[in-house]
């Protein structure tokens, strides 16, 4: 969200969307605005597939509860924390949550119920795949990130979820 502007969610496309003027909208549809000079630093998606986008400040972003749905997280600058939990992980790589702009040395992956020693860091067609070793579930895909750059310094323990 950017101060003084609107963000749409669900099936709503903008402030002039005809759905807003009818009785056809439903839970999960909406339009949200915040005041000028306001900055939101944390965002949590819902239980479906979400595209959660931060702003230029240090954001903490979490795709929301639900395994088997693909969330995409984008920090958009700042030293961001991308939160993951084993309960959201999946064995289906096509449904794994992804981080579209992870910056090694600046951003962090926040682990809710894991530690770095629980993980395997692997190559996946030029992306980095972060796996819980015990369950073989994928916690995150880091789009376009060389897996050899990722080490324990990229992870922190969080209590966000």
Where are these regions (language model features)?
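Hydrophobic residues in beta-strands and at strand termini
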Residues: 1, 84, 111, 141-144
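Low-complexity acidic/polar repeat-biased segments
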Residues: 3-29, 37-41, 119-161
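Short, histidine-centered active-site or binding-site loop motifs used for metal coordination
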Residues: 44, 86, 134
